[in-house]
A protein has these predicted regions:
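Alpha-helical oligomerization segments
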Residues: 123-135
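Intrinsic disorder/low-complexity segments
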Residues: 3, 21, 35-36, 80, ...
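Short, basic amphipathic alpha-helical segments that act as recognition/interaction helices
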Residues: 40-63, 99-123
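Residue-level detector of intrinsically disordered, flexible termini
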Residues: 1, 33, 48-50, 59, ...
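Short Lys/Arg-rich basic patches
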Residues: 1-25, 58-85, 94, 132-135
Length: 135
């Protein structure tokens, strides 16, 4: 399926590949709906959310030692269509925040949907404090 950018001629659809991650099922549907409103692909919406909210998330997390894989209840596999450069950019932001791709995308998606940064960080902090959970 062509993305908004490929339809505008900025990227060929063949330049993009599946990039997998897991999201809470309810959040996944909210992200799909938000992208749909803008007539964007989910990948484009996630990239925009990461660009807008990634720096704020990184600042809010500070030096907090987080679990790299917080447990996700009712997780749903999600495939984003991204170029290699877009995937690397997303992963670089995740690593800078001390998170894996799924946790980072979950956090910036929640921020992009209007949740407060303190609530998102508190949930990550709670995951960091749960003993005996190795992702």
């Amino acid at each position: 399926m062509a993305t908004t950018r490929s339809r505008r001629g900025e990227r060929g659809p063949s330049d993009r590949r599946h990039v997998g991650l897991t999201l809470p099922r309810e959040l996944k549907q909210r992200v799909i709906d938000a992208a749909d409103v803008l007539h964007w692909s989910v990948g484009d919406w996630v990239l925009a959310a990461a660009a807008e909210h990634g720096p704020c998330l990184r600042t809010a997390l500070g030096t907090l030692a987080l679990r790299r894989r917080p447990r996700v209840h009712d997780a749903a596999f999600t495939a984003l269509y991204l170029t290699a450069e877009e995937r690397d950019e997303l992963d670089d932001q995740a690593v800078a925040c001390g998170l894996n791709r799924s946790a980072f995308v979950t956090a910036v998606a929640r921020l992009g949907l209007g949740e407060d940064v303190e609530v998102v960080v508190a949930d990550l902090r709670d995951a960091a404090d749960v003993p005996g959970q190795d992702g």
